[in-house]
């Protein structure tokens, strides 16, 4: 399916975006190995998260999926209750699922194969294979990409590991392995990354130690069931935050969005560019802060993106670059090499699409330079990346003509009702089939 957009006359209204994808992954995994029953409200029923649910079910976890209510009811099997699956576990398109499961499975008393779709089979896994091997895991792969064959070792040993880059997925993978390791596992990261795993471990009553740059867990503990309500995903909210910011006449409110400080890079950077964003009704539940976000149209200016904001914005850069494309002046992103190993090379995909829509964009090895201008209509390719697809749908709100985005089926991995909510607030996006032009 493709998306086709026409310019918007302005966004208005109040919507609630679906549950946070990162928290959904972690919540169901930890609930599955906890003792007792956990109800998960607000679970994201996207393809990536459902791949995680399926993998856990194949290992004996009892998970009732109430899809129309976004609820899971999980009967935990305890730390040692997982069973060997009868076949390879398919993680679909989800890098988070395969990396978290690798950490969980490294210390089990059985062997497992983890695989995924063609995109996932190109994503780098050396970053988890190397430290897991130091803990005593044995993992076979060809070229350090999936499929991964994990030979479970119940006698893992804790390590002190310095992450070469800020990565919540790698950090979480090692913390999960550390739950099954003898001794203490300590992870030090060069800059803060999202900390949902740490918060959820605390929510499930697991003891951990944390300071400014390091997090430590000791093996041999237990997780205790604890109901959880998942906030809206700020990565999904970001599409509407940018769309309302760049489209004249816009004013929208996004309800109950997760505002974890390790995820606020997109708001921090948009405010630096001049955005009118107000965060209100701040509350904290299940260890995670939430708030309502009100956004009004504003004129933006280009900026040099501070390096310390890059790890806090890594999933939101595709749509942030749309904001940069219509800002006055130049925006420069560096230290973003991680964008090249996402579902697609997001630097190359964004530069290609922006150039097709008339914007001066230059690719750097670890980032991009964008000279703000006027978005033209045209046709772009999402390269089967959900965030690229939705970012260019946002571009269509302000473009001078219709924009067609190719290959958008993958949006279902993270935001199944994106088109519905986009039209609800006035974005003018529709799904179309076939190869016809405008």
From Swiss-Prot:
<keyword id="KW-0057">Aromatic amino acid biosynthesis</keyword>
<comment type="function">
    <text>Catalyzes the transfer of the enolpyruvyl moiety of phosphoenolpyruvate (PEP) to the 5-hydroxyl of shikimate-3-phosphate (S3P) to produce enolpyruvyl shikimate-3-phosphate and inorganic phosphate.</text>
</comment>
<dbReference type="GO" id="GO:0009073">
    <property type="term" value="P:aromatic amino acid family biosynthetic process"/>
</dbReference>
<dbReference type="InterPro" id="IPR036968">
    <property type="entry name" value="Enolpyruvate_Tfrase_sf"/>
</dbReference>
<feature type="binding site">
    <location>
        <position position="169"/>
    </location>
    <ligand>
        <name>3-phosphoshikimate</name>
    </ligand>
</feature>
<feature type="binding site">
    <location>
        <position position="346"/>
    </location>
    <ligand>
        <name>phosphoenolpyruvate</name>
    </ligand>
</feature>
<feature type="binding site">
    <location>
        <position position="169"/>
    </location>
    <ligand>
        <name>phosphoenolpyruvate</name>
    </ligand>
</feature>
<feature type="binding site">
    <location>
        <position position="123"/>
    </location>
    <ligand>
        <name>phosphoenolpyruvate</name>
    </ligand>
</feature>
<feature type="binding site">
    <location>
        <position position="342"/>
    </location>
    <ligand>
        <name>3-phosphoshikimate</name>
    </ligand>
</feature>
<dbReference type="InterPro" id="IPR001986">
    <property type="entry name" value="Enolpyruvate_Tfrase_dom"/>
</dbReference>
<dbReference type="InterPro" id="IPR013792">
    <property type="entry name" value="RNA3'P_cycl/enolpyr_Trfase_a/b"/>
</dbReference>
<feature type="binding site">
    <location>
        <position position="22"/>
    </location>
    <ligand>
        <name>3-phosphoshikimate</name>
    </ligand>
</feature>
<dbReference type="InterPro" id="IPR023193">
    <property type="entry name" value="EPSP_synthase_CS"/>
</dbReference>
<dbReference type="Pfam" id="PF00275">
    <property type="entry name" value="EPSP_synthase"/>
</dbReference>
<dbReference type="GO" id="GO:0005737">
    <property type="term" value="C:cytoplasm"/>
</dbReference>
<feature type="binding site">
    <location>
        <position position="21"/>
    </location>
    <ligand>
        <name>phosphoenolpyruvate</name>
    </ligand>
</feature>
<protein>
    <recommendedName>
        <fullName>3-phosphoshikimate 1-carboxyvinyltransferase</fullName>
        <ecNumber>2.5.1.19</ecNumber>
    </recommendedName>
</protein>
<feature type="binding site">
    <location>
        <position position="167"/>
    </location>
    <ligand>
        <name>3-phosphoshikimate</name>
    </ligand>
</feature>
<keyword id="KW-0808">Transferase</keyword>
<feature type="binding site">
    <location>
        <position position="21"/>
    </location>
    <ligand>
        <name>3-phosphoshikimate</name>
    </ligand>
</feature>
<feature type="binding site">
    <location>
        <position position="26"/>
    </location>
    <ligand>
        <name>3-phosphoshikimate</name>
    </ligand>
</feature>
<comment type="similarity">
    <text>Belongs to the EPSP synthase family.</text>
</comment>
<keyword id="KW-0028">Amino-acid biosynthesis</keyword>
<dbReference type="InterPro" id="IPR006264">
    <property type="entry name" value="EPSP_synthase"/>
</dbReference>
<dbReference type="GO" id="GO:0003866">
    <property type="term" value="F:3-phosphoshikimate 1-carboxyvinyltransferase activity"/>
</dbReference>
<dbReference type="GO" id="GO:0009423">
    <property type="term" value="P:chorismate biosynthetic process"/>
</dbReference>
<comment type="pathway">
    <text>Metabolic intermediate biosynthesis; chorismate biosynthesis; chorismate from D-erythrose 4-phosphate and phosphoenolpyruvate: step 6/7.</text>
</comment>
<feature type="binding site">
    <location>
        <position position="95"/>
    </location>
    <ligand>
        <name>phosphoenolpyruvate</name>
    </ligand>
</feature>
<comment type="subunit">
    <text>Monomer.</text>
</comment>
<feature type="active site" description="Proton acceptor">
    <location>
        <position position="315"/>
    </location>
</feature>
<feature type="binding site">
    <location>
        <position position="315"/>
    </location>
    <ligand>
        <name>3-phosphoshikimate</name>
    </ligand>
</feature>
<feature type="binding site">
    <location>
        <position position="387"/>
    </location>
    <ligand>
        <name>phosphoenolpyruvate</name>
    </ligand>
</feature>
<dbReference type="GO" id="GO:0008652">
    <property type="term" value="P:amino acid biosynthetic process"/>
</dbReference>
<keyword id="KW-0963">Cytoplasm</keyword>
């Amino acid at each position: 399916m493709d998306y086709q957009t026409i310019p918007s006359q302005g966004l208005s209204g109040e919507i609630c975006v679906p549950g946070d994808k990162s928290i959904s992954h972690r919540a169901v995994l930890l609930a599955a190995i906890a003792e007792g029953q956990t109800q998960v409200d607000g679970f994201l029923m996207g393809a990536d998260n459902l791949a995680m649910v399926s993998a856990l079910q194949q290992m004996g976890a009892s998970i009732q999926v109430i899809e129309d209510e976004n609820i899971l009811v999980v009967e935990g099997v305890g730390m040692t209750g997982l069973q060997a699956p009868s076949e390879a576990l398919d993680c679909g398109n989800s890098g988070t699922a395969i990396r978290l499961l690798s950490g969980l499975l490294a210390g089990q008393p059985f062997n497992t194969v983890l695989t995924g779709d063609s995109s996932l089979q190109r994503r780098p896994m050396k970053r988890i294979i190397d430290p897991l091997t130091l803990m005593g895991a044995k993992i076979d792969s060809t070229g350090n990409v999936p499929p991964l064959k994990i030979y479970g070792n119940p006698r893992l040993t804790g390590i002190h590991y310095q992450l070469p880059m800020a990565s919540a997925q790698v950090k979480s993978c090692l913390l999960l392995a550390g739950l099954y390791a003898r001794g203490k596992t300590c992870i030090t990261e060069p800059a803060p990354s999202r900390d949902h795993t740490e918060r959820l471990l605390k929510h499930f009553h697991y003891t951990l130690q944390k300071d400014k740059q390091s997090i430590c867990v000791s093996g041999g503990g237990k997780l205790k069931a604890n109901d959880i309500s998942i906030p809206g995903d700020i990565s999904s909210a970001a599409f509407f935050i940018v769309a309302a910011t760049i489209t004249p006449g816009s004013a929208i409110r996004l309800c109950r969005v997760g505002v974890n400080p390790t995820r606020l890079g997109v708001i921090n950077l948009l405010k630096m560019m001049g955005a009118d964003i107000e965060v209100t009704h701040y509350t904290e539940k299940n260890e995670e802060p939430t708030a309502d976000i009100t956004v009004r149209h504003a004129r933006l200016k280009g900026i040099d993106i501070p390096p310390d904001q890059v790890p806090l914005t890594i999933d939101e850069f595709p749509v942030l670059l749309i904001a940069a494309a219509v800002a006055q002046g130049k925006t420069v992103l560096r230290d973003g090499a991680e964008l090249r190993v996402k579902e697609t090379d997001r630097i190359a995909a964004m530069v290609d699409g922006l150039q097709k829509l008339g914007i001066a964009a230059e690719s750097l090895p670890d980032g991009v330079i964008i000279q703000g201008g006027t978005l033209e209509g045209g046709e772009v390719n999402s390269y089967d990346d959900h965030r690229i697809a939705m970012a260019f749908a946002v571009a269509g709100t302000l473009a001078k003509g219709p924009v067609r985005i190719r290959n958008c089926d993958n949006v279902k991995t993270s935001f199944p009702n994106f088109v519905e909510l986009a039209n609800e607030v006035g974005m003018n996006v529709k799904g179309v089939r076939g190869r016809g032009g405008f």
